[in-house]
């Protein structure tokens, strides 16, 4: 059985792990204050619906956005309760470092966990297997199910000694939604991640998007290339047979370099800290087992290098664990609050801004259209109105009728062209009676040619002034809402930046 130097050193080191929490109270307090201040700022920045006509497109957009915003904020407590459910696992193992064994189905996760458990047991360390079901821990004497995790809706794991936990997950790309959801739910329990992929297709780029989330959570991540072996034909006792062999060091180095390079490129494009990605190591669990895990076989199968790398991984994982309560809260603030706003509300806000700016562009044409429509509605009626009052020459009646007609015409056109706006018609310009407004008597007949000309000019001026006043009201309403969009954008940006600063302060090492 095993007695290699790095294996022994790793096991001894895990026995000395001290997992006391660091001084994170200030960080927790700062993040809670950030959350409360952000919630207050958002609630105080809902759109003012005053000035918008109910049941119109823009009014409904703003109303729906307000509802979504306030609902999103009010759900934070419920979402936090759900998000922190993974602590039911973490609290049971609060004094141990937990490494999540991560990878797609058939990556050899359970096989590797079982072999590491045997290494610990061979060094007289306690080994205890368990599985997680319905968020409860159940201990068992059985090894982890190799190749069977896909058929279960549970996580399984093993306690190695007194201070180290390996949590084996259902396949990362499990065909079972329940498995994938369970994996994601408990992923926050881990202090570091072992990313396993088979040497037949190591480090598939499409997996890195899922890994990026863990790296953004600032957990150290260690890629392990499993099944680093091959089958060759050999003649034994005169018979041709197949023999399993380790890949040579050059082959392994080539694959490891390729995985590291592609992973770094991908993570860099995802804007995550590539320093958290550790150099990959290649192993063959099967080759180690076939030689009864003797020291030479373990070394040739890559396990001396694996344990050396795990030894280097423990320190950053331990630092993560010591600040874990603050990290879990930070993850929630980043992923559910900031990202939630970005994906749930930002598209709506962008659409509102686009529609408001389009409405501004439309006002330029509406200014002309509105004035012409009112003008054409009133002017054709003027000759008949003047004839109607010719016998009495009642200028007051003429002026009052014109003002009333202009108001009615504006009301009708506003309902057609500017129905979104709650406009104030009391401030519209009116035709005022002047000395020039008189009927004339020519050859004993009452005529109104001069009066018609004067009133035509007055109608034109009143319509023009009123149209400008109404368009100005619309413009002011649009500018107010556009400014509000900008205020919300600035609020998102400012609070995101403030949270980034809290994140950096938490992770200063």
Curated annotation (Swiss-Prot):
InterPro entries in UniProt: GTP-bd, P-loop_NTPase, TRAFAC_Dynamin-like_GTPase
One BP term from GO: catabolic process
Gene Ontology MF terms: GTP binding
SUPFAM superfamilies documented for this protein: P-loop containing nucleoside triphosphate hydrolases
Annotated G domain residues: 108-225
The keyword Repeat appears for this protein: no
Superkingdom, natural source: Bacteria
Name of the protein in question: Uncharacterized protein ACIAD1444
Organism whose genome encodes this protein: Acinetobacter baylyi (strain ATCC 33305 / BD413 / ADP1)
